[in-house]
UniProtKB/Swiss-Prot annotation:
Cofactor note (record): Binds 1 [4Fe-4S] cluster per subunit.
InterPro entries, per the entry: 3-IsopropMal_deHydase_lsu, Acnase/IPM_dHydase_lsu_aba_1/3, Acoase/IPM_deHydtase_lsu_aba, Aconitase_4Fe-4S_BS, Aconitase_4Fe-4S_dom, IPM_dehydratase_rel_enz, IPMI_cat
Protein family membership: Belongs to the aconitase/IPM isomerase family. LeuC type 1 subfamily.
GO annotation terms (biological process): L-leucine biosynthetic process
Organism: Xanthomonas euvesicatoria pv. vesicatoria (strain 85-10) (Xanthomonas campestris pv. vesicatoria)
Protein name: 3-isopropylmalate dehydratase large subunit
Documented EC number(s): 4.2.1.33
Chain spans, region Disordered: 60-79
NCBIfam families: leuC, PRK05478.1, PRK12466.1
Amino acid sequence: MTAKTLYDKLWDLHEVTRRDDGSSLIYIDRHILHEVTSPQAFEGLRLAGRKPWRIDANIATPDHNVPTTRAERQGGLESISDEVSRLQVQTLDENCDDFGILEFKMNDTRQGIVHVVGPEQGATLPGMTVVCGDSHTSTHGAFGALAHGIGTSEVEHVLATQCLIAKKMKNMQVRVEGTLPFGVTAKDIVLAVIGKIGTAGGNGHALEFAGSAIRAASMEGRMTICNMAIEAGARVGMVAVDEKTIAYVKGRPFAPKGAHWDAAVALWSTLVSDPDAHFDTVVELRAEDIKPQVSWGTSPEMVLAIDQHVPDPAAEQDPTKRDSIERALKYMGLTANQPITAIRLDRVFIGSCTNSRIEDLRAAAAVAKGRKVASTIKQALVVPGSGLVKAQAEAEGLDKVFLDAGFEWREPGCSMCLAMNPDKLGSGEHCASTSNRNFEGRQGAGGRTHLVSPAMAAAAAVSGHFVDVRELGDSGVGIRDS
């Protein structure tokens, strides 16, 4: 029998038929919807006189456009000041009501960012194919699932047929062996990977993360890593199923029960790459070599360790790369050879589908406890990824830690990850952000984004500039997974 990778196994389990042109019809187990990429898809169903093929395979929640202050949320839909944003959230409510799709509406305790809500509800399960009209759907691959983002026309296609046409990708394995040093996290792993292979390194590949450092990561940490596979150029990121995966899923609302659970676990336990499976590309890193990472430029691959300096374009021989560095330095308002620790900040954002889970908040709170946000920081936001994460954090007293330190404690949503809601950067402002993208204008027109882990973001907030979180001593305990 031919040895298979995890991706091979998931593909074979869901391939309905193979076409003459080399593409395949793939069955989709779970479809997650939000307010931005679904309106036209639902309208397409109406115009064609169709209904969703499998209503129970879909769940929905608004996240991109929702406001995050308590006052705005208490005001309901009318409190959404932007007309387009308000219409999109309202339209999602109406579409889900009309078609009978389960939606966690804006003020439902279960509402949150789609890539946080799916796993915590058990709607994401090992062995599934999972799609959503959002590129960071790769997050769900942390569960040994085949998960990727789709466009609006594909959202309609999945609603109507529960299938998609796709071509099989190549296999890439990223192996991270060893033990992470104190103060180094899952976010640092994935930023280091992107720094090594670049934002095109995974093009055309399904990327499996493996190795002892990945196995040691929590499910939250694995979700962080798979979340940013797309920034490494791969549409799909995944981690093999193990006992941590199964323990996380057990007992969640959508998880199988009783005999169905036992049968599911038996299948899930096979969702690992065979020992002699072939990977088209293998990338290796040593965990011990990874330090806390900070992005300095306008692409996720423009990332350095905290103890390094911003690059000098004059030292770059490749003219294309030299021009890219020069443009990034100009946009970011930085100078060649500037120490990363000399980058001063205006705002701090802890949240997003990358880093807004309970372990992320615990890690940031461990650093913030007993400290104060620096007087030079205009705003430091903490935005939980869901209402359930928020409730758990409050039960643990994390909200009080943040509030005492001078952070703002918000309601769940995508928030400052992207400029589609009231939480935005002003032009020229530097932000330490736990999100996943640092393109020009991503967090607001002219805004300057630096990608970091939650612990590094909290350390920057209390310092006013980037610092090595490892130098803050025992406060860094427990930050490894985030």
